[in-house]
Amino acid sequence: MNSIVNDLNRALAQHLLVNVYQTNQEVVYTGYVTTVSDTGIILATYDDYGIPDGAVFLDLTAIDEVEFSSDDLDNMAFRIQTAQDEQFVQAGGLTLQFDGHRDLKRQVLSHAWVDHLVLMLVLKDDEHFYEGIVTSVAAEQVSLQLLNKFDYTDQPLLTLTPKDIEVIEFQGQELTLQGIALPHLQKLSHVAPTTVTDADQFVPTLQQLVGKEPLVALVPKHNRELFFVGRINTVTADGVIMNLLDMTGQFGGYTLMRLSELHEIVLKSDYLQTMRLFALLNRARQQPIQPVLNDERLFDATVDQFGARISQAAAFRTIIRLKLHDGTDLLGFPSQVGGQRFIFHEIDDQQVDQVGQ
């Protein structure tokens, strides 16, 4: 433990970008240490795009390793610089100040209570993640009104002791947006999911949605726990192109899915209501899209879009992600496209920036 504390103090003193690995969770936090106490730390974190994404409190007992140097950190430093150079929308950075000589965990909970911040908690010996609003903070007890974006009927009051809390995420982009949206979310009523599962109805349903405002979710056969949320852009003879929304309600690129791989279309759900509200709030704040992206692309429904997208990616050396019939996930870029074959140059996330330069 002493070596971990020494590493954390070094990262704080030298303002080093670090990866913090946890003992009980696979989530790795990347960022700058802003406060170190005898029981925990505050880490100002960044998302995968290099954008400030709030902060996290980590109990010292939850920290397994502090990494100072790696390809992943070099990659993230490049992304952070790119986000600054391209003036990415940054609405979720750490703004709170903390005293390292006082109980950090209690400071975070008290700030959240006073400022009505949405938090994400991880508890000891509990694999669940809890999102909610702090409703009370006492010496040995904290109450949290849970929020469930997927089911508005499942939002109980959680009472726990502070010593059971290992991780607290706060002020991140998604959590901040949830806080802004909360008064509006509380006015929305629960809706039972409306879905289309009959494959014969997929094409007519999707064609009716082309170019329209309603958000839908597409659920693929290969992983029915995975789903894509967005608006239908184009329907071809064998595929559908969707303008995606990410978890913060911003434009998140495009996905092309074969109709034969589609398991279900979700037309109504509580989560779709939530994402629609997030998207509307982003528009009102003039933050619907990052400046380097283009959400106005049109695609020819009469063209084989699978071949067209692969040929274009090869021509411009664009990074794409492929999902094969057997569920294999590949990230990289194609070349030598011709006939029914092409060469795919697979890379990992740590290589993306070097390829993209």
Q: Which residues are covered by each model-predicted region?
A:
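Short, conserved beta-turn/loop elements at beta-strand boundaries and strand-helix junctions
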Residues: 36-41, 68-71, 137-142, 170-172, ...
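Low-complexity, glycine/alanine/valine/leucine- and proline-rich hydrophobic stretches
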Residues: 335-336, 341-352
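Short glycine-rich, low-complexity segments
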Residues: 1-28, 47-129, 148-225, 246-327, ...
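Short beta-strand-centered aromatic/proline hotspots
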Residues: 29-35, 128-136, 226-234, 329-337
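Hydrophobic beta-strand residues in large extracellular and virion-surface proteins
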Residues: 18-20, 33, 41, 119-121, ...
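N-terminal beta-strand/beta-hairpin edge segment
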Residues: 33-34, 38-51, 244
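Short acidic, gly/pro-rich beta-turn/loop elements at beta-sheet edges
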Residues: 30, 41, 53, 142, ...
